Amino acid sequence: MEESQSELNIDPPLSQETFSELWNLLPENNVLSSELCPAVDELLLPESVVNWLDEDSDDAPRMPATSAPTAPGPAPSWPLSSSVPSPKTYPGTYGFRLGFLHSGTAKSVTWTYSPLLNKLFCQLAKTCPVQLWVSSPPPPNTCVRAMAIYKKSEFVTEVVRRCPHHERCSDSSDGLAPPQHLIRVEGNLRAKYLDDRNTFRHSVVVPYEPPEVGSDYTTIHYNYMCNSSCMGGMNRRPILTIITLEDSSGNVLGRNSFEVRVCACPGRDRRTEEENFHKKGEPCPEPPPGSTKRALPPSTSSSPPQKKKPLDGEYFTLQIRGRERYEMFRNLNEALELKDAQSGKEPGGSRAHSSHLKAKKGQSTSRHKKLMFKREGLDSD
């Protein structure tokens, strides 16, 4: 009991007496003035809302002033790209057209152009000069773009690229050209190889250079870095090369195109396709107006075959000296007569020939017997 009584006599640190002493230390007036502590509303609401609430009630309620929504900025200007480039010929105001040097169909040629088919035949990674003709000089900063597309409609939306084998075989000689690009420019360090950000098509662009003194055209040397028969690449699908003349903003000033086949023997393939073209009797594609592509003269092989004349039924007498020669010619004649009779071309004539042949054969045998009898009589004498 004594211990508990002693504990009650000890004042706790925050007992009632201690609190009363602390309360007396506070000032008598303005205990909760705004100078000592901020208002509760100010602690919970932003300053703009508090000022709006403190305004006179007679004024119409207004929302706090906020900045007006700004219009969205213009979209970045991307160059306009068509998903399927047009191969249609468009000379434009500058009379843009293409030309090719005259080339034969020998086995040794590395490239050859067929005006009849409007088609270029070339070997892998061989230089193919293409002439650019204009009727008037284009504006400064004009460029020339080359792009490959598939010719058939079922493949035209696909991107023409090299096969995986040739893409892996790229070496340091490729220079700035990416390994997947099919068309490359030779001898021009200012060539740019581009991938369209919308269609992912490959193209190569070079600045347009005016013709040199004494020349009427500009020449660009192109290379094709994959065969048309490569699996995983073109895979025997025909392609077109589109050459466009463009200004600095990408607007097309002129356009032209031609078909391309990359093969091992350009001369042989050109001869074969031209012969098949004549056999089919397809109309010759008209070259673009003002083009320097010369069409081949029409071949005589396309004319209809002439009908064979009927056999002549007239008989002729041929005098032959010597029996051996006579027998030889007689056997030859009999063989020809038998051939005509078996072919059935002249049924009436063959019968007449056969009957005449039998009569002549009978006469020859009788004469032969008479000669034999005479010889035997001389021997017996």
UniProtKB/Swiss-Prot annotation:
Q: Which residues carry this modification: N6-acetyllysine?
A: K107, K293, K309, K361, K369, K370
Q: Where is the composition biased (Basic and acidic residues)?
A: 270-283
Chain positions covered by the region annotation Basic (repression of DNA-binding): 356-375
This chain's function reads: Multifunctional transcription factor that induces cell cycle arrest, DNA repair or apoptosis upon binding to its target DNA sequence. Acts as a tumor suppressor in many tumor types; induces growth arrest or apoptosis depending on the physiological circumstances and cell type. Negatively regulates cell division by controlling expression of a set of genes required for this process. One of the activated genes is an inhibitor of cyclin-dependent kinases. Apoptosis induction seems to be mediated either by stimulation of BAX and FAS antigen expression, or by repression of Bcl-2 expression.
Comp. bias intervals (Basic residues): 353-372
Q: Where is region (Interaction with USP7) located?
A: 347-351
Q: Where is this cross-link: Glycyl lysine isopeptide (Lys-Gly) (interchain with G-Cter in SUMO)?
A: K374
Q: Which residues carry this modification: Omega-N-methylarginine?
A: R321
Subcellular location(s) of the protein: Cytoplasm; Nucleus; Nucleus, PML body; Endoplasmic reticulum
Provide the positions where the record notes the PTM N6,N6-dimethyllysine: K358, K361, K370
Q: Which residues carry this modification: Symmetric dimethylarginine?
A: R323, R325
Protein name, per record: Cellular tumor antigen p53
Q: How is the cofactor bound?
A: Binds 1 zinc ion per subunit.
Q: Where is this region: Interaction with CCAR2?
A: 1-308
Where do the record's region annotations for Interaction with HIPK1 lie?
A: 87-358
Q: Where is this cross-link: Glycyl lysine isopeptide (Lys-Gly) (interchain with G-Cter in ubiquitin)?
A: K279, K280, K339, K345
Phosphoserine PTM positions = S15, S20, S33, S170, S257, S303, S380
Its source organism is Canis lupus familiaris (Dog)
**Gene3D superfamilies assigned:** 2.60.40.720, 6.10.50.20, p53-like tetramerisation domain (4.10.170.10)
PTM comment: the record says: Phosphorylation on Ser residues mediates transcriptional activation. Phosphorylated on Thr-18 by VRK1, which may prevent the interaction with MDM2. Phosphorylated on Ser-20 by CHEK2 in response to DNA damage, which prevents ubiquitination by MDM2. Phosphorylated on Ser-20 by PLK3 in response to reactive oxygen species (ROS), promoting p53/TP53-mediated apoptosis. Phosphorylated on Ser-33 by CDK7 in a CAK complex in response to DNA damage. Phosphorylated by HIPK1. Monomethylated at Lys-360 by SETD7, leading to stabilization and increased transcriptional activation. Monomethylated at Lys-358 by SMYD2, leading to decreased DNA-binding activity and subsequent transcriptional regulation activity. Lys-360 monomethylation prevents interaction with SMYD2 and subsequent monomethylation at Lys-358. Dimethylated at Lys-361 by EHMT1 and EHMT2. Monomethylated at Lys-370 by KMT5A, promoting interaction with L3MBTL1 and leading to repress transcriptional activity.
Q: Which gene encodes it?
A: TP53
Q: Which cofactor does it need?
A: Zn(2+)
